[in-house]
From Swiss-Prot:
<dbReference type="InterPro" id="IPR005825">
    <property type="entry name" value="Ribosomal_uL24_CS"/>
</dbReference>
<dbReference type="GO" id="GO:0005840">
    <property type="term" value="C:ribosome"/>
</dbReference>
<dbReference type="InterPro" id="IPR008991">
    <property type="entry name" value="Translation_prot_SH3-like_sf"/>
</dbReference>
<comment type="function">
    <text>One of two assembly initiator proteins, it binds directly to the 5'-end of the 23S rRNA, where it nucleates assembly of the 50S subunit.</text>
</comment>
<dbReference type="InterPro" id="IPR005824">
    <property type="entry name" value="KOW"/>
</dbReference>
<comment type="subunit">
    <text>Part of the 50S ribosomal subunit.</text>
</comment>
<dbReference type="Pfam" id="PF00467">
    <property type="entry name" value="KOW"/>
</dbReference>
<dbReference type="Pfam" id="PF17136">
    <property type="entry name" value="ribosomal_L24"/>
</dbReference>
<dbReference type="InterPro" id="IPR014722">
    <property type="entry name" value="Rib_uL2_dom2"/>
</dbReference>
<dbReference type="GO" id="GO:0006412">
    <property type="term" value="P:translation"/>
</dbReference>
<comment type="similarity">
    <text>Belongs to the universal ribosomal protein uL24 family.</text>
</comment>
<dbReference type="GO" id="GO:0019843">
    <property type="term" value="F:rRNA binding"/>
</dbReference>
<dbReference type="InterPro" id="IPR003256">
    <property type="entry name" value="Ribosomal_uL24"/>
</dbReference>
<protein>
    <recommendedName>
        <fullName>Large ribosomal subunit protein uL24</fullName>
    </recommendedName>
</protein>
<dbReference type="InterPro" id="IPR041988">
    <property type="entry name" value="Ribosomal_uL24_KOW"/>
</dbReference>
<dbReference type="GO" id="GO:1990904">
    <property type="term" value="C:ribonucleoprotein complex"/>
</dbReference>
<keyword id="KW-0689">Ribosomal protein</keyword>
């Protein structure tokens, strides 16, 4: 998976299509990402202690990695990521559309 925590992504499919957000967490075994403020789900939580009341919690659900694309905030464009190897042997990520090196 080429996305990392802290990357800005744009949703390209689903109910939140076109929205952007920051990756909070990646789940590489499942090929999914959790994006801040997107794909919200409502969960009803029962009280766990005496005197506590139940509540309704909204939280981010995961999105499949194929439904999001890296978003360049500098160029305002979504693009695929390619991995390149520098002459010193270090690996970098680069945007296919703009050629911008991410890290």
């Amino acid at each position: 998976m080429r996305l990392r925590k802290g990357d800005t992504v744009q949703v390209i499919a689903g109910k939140d299509k076109g929205k952007t957000g920051e990756v909070l967490r990646t789940l590489p075994n499942e090929n999914r990402v959790i994006v801040e403020g997107l794909n919200m789900r409502t969960r009803h939580v029962k009280p766990t202690q005496e005197g506590e009341t139940g509540r309704i919690v909204t939280e981010e659900a995961s999105l499949h990695a194929s439904n999001v694309m890296f978003y360049s905030t500098a160029k305002k464009v979504a693009s695929r990521i390619e991995l390149i190897t520098e002459k010193d042997g270090s690996k970098k990520r680069r945007l296919k559309k703009t050629g911008e090196v991410i890290d």
